[in-house]
Structure formats: structure tokens, C-alpha cells
């Protein structure tokens, strides 16, 4: 009988997987290539053969994150075909799982905070990724019939970022535990606004004689009386 065991991961895959785990635990700047290579069961020479530098390895790790997120979007579409509102609610549920995870935050968000230099090779990739995710969420909101789609996309994005920080500072039982309830309430509020609210209609009154203010009328009457007395 043939051995159906899965083939062991290749050196490149082991390096990326190990690096992602170590970056999440210790921070990108808190771990060196020697430790990554050792824990990946390889050596520094092999690491540099696959990745020209540690910065290149960081970008490769972030590309893996982006691929996982792309698979997440594909999953929404497969689970709820032609139902953008259901996909939007699926995004909220997935966001809750992400925010309430192991407390180490999102790899992409952590890298954005740690790699603040504008000239870092990973910085441009992070910004493009974040912008693309925001645009994609906004498109989904528009497909769901939300009038202020861009505003809802930003509201949900900020809610997710805040939930991740809350998970790290207040724990899993903190405000992040109510992410789904809050996210769905926000969607419902925007969805109800999308139906259109009737604006109050004001009747235009027919033009008539201008009303004289009461004080002005009194002054006028007094002036008239004074003139009569002077005659």
C-alpha cells in the first residue's frame, strides 16, 4: 500500500511559517535571522538563498497574510453567492474571530505599527493592502444597497482595529467580546438609512401684508398719539 503521508514542507515554507510565528510572539525587530533559521530547521545560508534579506522575508510573510485574507473573501462569496448583505455579516463574524484570537493582534496591523519608516520595503505593501481591503469592503457595502458605503466601510474598519487593541489591553472578555453585536448594529443603522427617509415638507404661505413687530407697533401708536397732541 502506497504511503499517502503528506510531503514535509519545503525549506522556504518552513522559514516563512516559523518567521510569522516568531514575529507574532516577539515582534519583527525582536527576533533575528539566526533564530528563525535554527527554529525552521535550516541555516542562515539557506534563508538568504530564498530571501535576500530579513526585510524580504518580512514582505514574504505579509504576502502570505494577504493570500489568507483573499481566501477569506472567496469563502464569503462561496458561502453566500449573490447575497452581499449576508457576505457583509460574514465579514463581521470573521472579524470577531480575528479580534478575539490569541491576543497578539493581526500580523499586518502589527507590522504597520512596528515598521513606521516610510522607506521600509514592507511599508508600501502594507499601505496598498490596507487600501485595497478598505475599497473592497466599500464595494461590498454598495452591493448591499448601503447609501453611504464608504462611511460604513470606514466605520467597520475602525471598529475592527479598535477591537484588536481592546483584546490586547482588556482581554477576551472586554469590549471586543461584543464585536458582532456592535458590528451588526452599525450595519443595520446604515441599512435603514439606505431606504431613504422622507424629508419634512414645508408649506409656503401665501404672500400677505407684512406683520409689524409688536414693540414697533406700540412705538408707532405712541408716536401717532404724540403728533395728535401736538396739533
Task: Please identify what each model-predicted range represents.
Residues 58-65, 72:
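Alpha-helical DNA-contacting segments of helix-turn-helix folds
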Residues 60, 74-104, 143, 153-156, ...:
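Hydrophobic alpha-helical connector segments
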Residues 14, 18-56, 60:
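Helix-turn-helix
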Residues 86-87, 99-124:
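Amphipathic alpha-helical segments used for helix-helix packing
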Residues 98, 157-175, 186-195:
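Amphipathic C-terminal alpha-helical segment
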Residues 69-70, 86-89, 118-143, 154, ...:
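Amphipathic alpha-helical packing segments from all-alpha helical-bundle domains
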Residues 8, 16, 62, 66, ...:
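Amphipathic, non-transmembrane alpha-helical scaffold segments
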Residues 1-10, 191-231:
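N-terminal intrinsically disordered/low-complexity leader segments
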Amino acid at each position: 500500500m502506497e504511503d499517502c503521508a503528506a510531503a514535509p514542507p519545503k525549506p522556504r515554507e518552513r522559514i516563512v511559517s516559523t518567521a510569522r510565528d516568531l514575529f507574532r510572539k516577539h515582534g519583527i525587530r525582536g527576533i533575528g535571522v539566526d533564530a528563525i533559521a535554527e527554529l525552521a530547521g535550516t541555516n542562515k545560508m539557506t534563508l538568504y538563498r530564498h530571501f535576500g534579506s530579513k526585510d524580504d522575508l518580512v514582505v514574504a510573510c505579509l504576502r502570505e497574510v494577504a493570500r489568507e485574507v483573499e481566501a477569506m473573501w472567496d469563502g464569503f462569496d462561496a458561502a453566500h453567492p449573490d447575497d452581499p448583505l449576508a457576505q457583509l455579516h460574514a465579514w463581521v463574524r470573521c472579524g470577531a474571530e480575528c479580534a478575539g484570537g490569541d491576543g497578539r493582534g493581526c500580523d499586518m496591523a502589527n507590522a504597520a505599527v512596528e515598521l513606521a519608516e516610510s522607506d521600509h520595503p514592507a511599508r508600501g505593501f502594507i499601505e496598498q493592502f490596507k487600501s485595497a481591503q478598505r475599497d473592497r469592503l466599500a464595494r461590498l457595502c454598495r452591493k448591499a444597497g448601503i447609501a453611504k458605503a464608504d462611511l460604513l466601510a470606514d466605520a467597520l474598519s475602525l471598529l475592527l482595529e479598535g477591537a484588536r487593541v481592546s483584546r490586547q489591553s482588556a482581554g477576551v472578555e472586554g469590549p471586543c467580546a461584543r464585536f458582532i453585536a456592535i458590528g451588526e448594529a452599525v450595519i443595520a443603522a446604515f441599512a435603514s438609512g439606505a431606504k431613504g427617509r422622507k424629508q419634512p415638507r414645508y408649506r409656503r404661505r401665501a404672500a400677505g401684508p407684512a406683520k409689524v413687530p409688536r414693540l414697533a407697533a406700540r412705538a408707532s401708536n405712541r408716536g401717532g398719539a404724540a403728533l395728535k397732541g401736538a396739533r
